[in-house]
Amino acid sequence: MPLPRQVAEDVNDARQRAAKRTKIIDILRRCRPMEPWPGHRQSGQSIPQDDSGVKGIASRLILTLHTNQAPNRFASIPVLWGILSWMRPHSSRLYNKDLAPTNPEQRTWGTYNFAALWVSMAHCIPTYMLASGLIGAGMSWGQALGTILLGNTIVLVPILLNSHAGTKHGIPFPVFARAAYGTFGSNVPALMRALVACGWFGIQAWIGGQALHVFFRSVWPGWAAAIPGSFGGHTATEWISFLLFWGLNVIVIYRGMDLLRKVENWAAPFVLVMTALLVWWALDRANGLGPILAQKGKFGSWREFWPVFVPSLTAMIGFWATLSLNMPDFTRFGRSQREQAIGQIVALPTTMTVFATMGVIITSASAIIYGKAIWDPVELVGKFTEPVIVAISMFTVVVATLSVNIAANVVSPANDFANAFPRLITFSRGGLLTGFIGIALQPWKLLADPSGYIFDWLLGYSGGLGSIAGVLIADYWILRRSELVVEDLYREEGIYERWRWTGIAATLLGCSAAWIGLVVPLLRPLYDYAWFVGFAVSFSTYLIFSSPLSVKKPSTATIYHS
């Protein structure tokens, strides 16, 4: 009995598709198994085409199948990418699994996670001591807290602008920078930012080690003298505590981002509660807020206040200037733009200001209780006579410092090093390298001056990071209108140059303008405005050097899917 015409046509179509499948399988059997393209699960991306050799033949066959207008096409895009995953259309010099775009299963961070991230990062000893450095420079407590609030509100703008790329495209900061600096040129801003983060890692690790040392001393009174000898002005047990805390950081690094998210979820509220209890203790023991809240600033006029306010404000921006660049490292795990934006807007300025206020209150009370203002909370708690209180307080400091150190000072440089040397360095190895560099920078010397890290450390590097932020924002929002071809960010011969010299030149000009005041006394005011100067110069010069016509467009042969 003859088959109906439509059935016969369907059978014939099925036979043709089966023959095409056989050809593809034969080709794939001759291909060396390779890692899948990093964006194969991402929606809205295009299929890269490679016309060379076996890969090109297979790619063209698959594209032919996909564009077939028959009612029952060969397969969906995910199936096609399952086949293409044997071909590696990306470059091994630009890709490893830690740099790959996140897939939907990895996007688990919501509003609370981003808010908790900032709360936990803000609750650290350097934040606690920010107001002390500003008050020491002559500000009143109100002026100091106002400067902190304003600085964190300003830096929130570039943070949100750069965060957008992480959530939209699922890419980390080093890959995001490839659009503006080139696929290999992106190593320049990535390594600049990484070195700053390494310095911060060392600072936080030393503070955490000191807290751990006091904790051990509270539970074991003979701890300080348990091991004789000293080095560099510090006892052997201090060095052991430092290395133990450093090791805790390494453990979290090797456990990955999911462990970080879990730690942040409970560490953030725990730190808030413990700090509030410390405020209650201080007010109860001092019978009042103390002399610092009552004293006025040393500046009698705006003319006297301005020369201190400007570099102080710039330093406050510099405090989180590192995160203004690499927030895509975190927002790539976000479920939506709305959730990541709300979490950051709510948490950053308020938490920084509230925690700094707590530091002012506690320190003010210490002036009454102990006869002098003690700005270092580790030193303050070390004076307590109740071992239980000391142990709980130091445990809080250790948890807070560990949380902020991993989130703020390990994630980005680890990705940066992996971006520069993807064949050799994974995220875990990059984190370990960050730890070693942090030790080599000798953080115990950086912390020798209690206010030096504000006017030397923060102010100094802010000019360089502001210059990078200017280029990234100009490229992503003005030239490219937030559109990126993600797969080409992982290819050497894609639409993005290997070295985009306009981005590098604009960054160097921004750095030069921001730092020239260090060598030319007449131009010292430029250094006081370092972040603003670096950002403005790099932003404007990048747009002058570039034009919309210089931005390569995706190939018309590219296929987009939903």
Residue ranges and their predicted role:
Residues A205, G209-S218, F270-G297, F319, ...:
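Hydrophobic alpha-helical segments and their helix-loop junctions in multi-pass secondary transporters
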Residues M192, I203, G209, I240-D284, ...:
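Membrane-interface loop-to-helix entry segments
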Residues A58-L61, L65-N68, N72-W141, L156, ...:
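Membrane-interface "cap" regions at the ends of multi-pass membrane proteins
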Residues C124-P126, L150-P158, M192-Q204, A268-D284, ...:
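Selective recognition of specific alpha-helical transmembrane segments in multi-pass small-molecule
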Residues P101, S428-G430, I468-T541, P548, ...:
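C-terminal membrane-solvent junction of multi-pass transporters and transport-like membrane proteins
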Residues A190, R217-Y254, P269-L278, S312-M327, ...:
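Transmembrane alpha-helical segments of multi-pass small-molecule transport proteins
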Residues S91-Y181, G185-V188, T322-P349, S364-A373:
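Transmembrane helix-boundary motif of multi-pass solute transporters/channels
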